[in-house]
Amino acid sequence: MNPLAQPIIYLTVFTGTLITALSSHWFFAWLGLEMNMLAFIPVLTKKTSPRSTEAAIKYFLTQATASMIFLMAILHNNMFSGQWTTANTTNPYSSLMIVTALAMKLGMAPFHFWVPEVTQGVPLTSGLLLLTWQKLAPISIMYQMYPSVDTNILLTLSILSILVGSWGGLNQTQLHKILAYSSITHMGWMVAVLPYNPNITILNLIIYITLTTTTFLILDLNSSTTILLLSRTWNKLTWLMPLISSTLLSLGGLPPLTGFLPKWAIIEEFAKNDNLIAPTIMAIISLLNLYFYARLIYITSITLLPMSNNVKMKWQFENTKPAPLLPTLTILTALLLPISPLILSIP
């Protein structure tokens, strides 16, 4: 990517998301999504390679299809209601098409097919933006229009996403794909609680972004893209071992770490609304998600690969990349659960 064009591209990505998030008019919401999508394609291909080009094409085709469905849905809604406001979506078919388009943009099942492949084909920094920042605009639209959507549709999408995300990550050796399937699972949890308490969805999104950012920073610091490379961390950056373990367990939702907080709040909200079957299914399926993170920790922290090299450890000579945000983010990924009553009491 041209260094001169890089600030303009990132500014356009930021502006597109901001327009969509702050808009109450369907046309401007669509316009922001388009700006964001077109500006994000150069971000995916900033390190030119056949794999990143393929990933960018897959991303463009999927997002363009979702945008066409979204535009058709808002025109259909305007034709029947005469309204352009996002909070006034009275036609059920329009609502269904909008949710379908947003689910495709979020990478929720059964429209998840592009997320692992695109994440695998791009650099770590681009993958981080894809799995965090690019979720903000679709979630903001869904947040505004959730009263117009059938709860059963959202629950079906959510449970299916949790199932696909948890099951799909079991057989992976590439860390990019594992984090992509984890993203699908987290999207399912966020959308599931949206009809009951949208504020918990926002809390879940903030915690998810914090955990995912911490994980990507650790992987970038360690230059790890596969489980095999991650297993050599003890020889490269010994001090990073406890950080990897706590972050991955928190991302899997193990108590008493921060990642358990949104799941706890969501299950409690379902119980308040006398819905016990859905959270039970979601919690049981999420154990698969926790399992493949526990497997990563076992390979990384507990097993010790045989080494025939008797020289000094590599970490004694290697210069560590600067990561000023990592200590703060690591604390947030592990220690927010004790103050959960304070967090949940915020209106």
From Swiss-Prot:
Spans traversing the lipid bilayer: 13-33, 55-75, 96-116, 122-142, 151-171, 178-198, 199-219, 237-257, 277-297, 326-346
Keyword line: Electron transport, Membrane, Mitochondrion, Mitochondrion inner membrane, NAD, Respiratory chain, Translocase, Transmembrane, Transmembrane helix, Transport, Ubiquinone
Membrane topology: Multi-pass membrane protein
Any Gene Ontology biological process: mitochondrial electron transport, NADH to ubiquinone
InterPro entries for the chain: Complex_I_Subunit_2, NADH_DH_su2_C, NADH_UbQ_OxRdtase_chain2, ND/Mrp_TM
This protein's GO CC annotations: mitochondrial inner membrane
Catalytic activity, reaction form: a ubiquinone + NADH + 5 H(+)(in) = a ubiquinol + NAD(+) + 4 H(+)(out)
Molecular function via GO: NADH dehydrogenase (ubiquinone) activity
EC number: 7.1.1.2
Biological function: Core subunit of the mitochondrial membrane respiratory chain NADH dehydrogenase (Complex I) which catalyzes electron transfer from NADH through the respiratory chain, using ubiquinone as an electron acceptor. Essential for the catalytic activity and assembly of complex I.
Protein family membership: Belongs to the complex I subunit 2 family.
Protein name: NADH-ubiquinone oxidoreductase chain 2
Natural source organism: Pongo pygmaeus (Bornean orangutan)
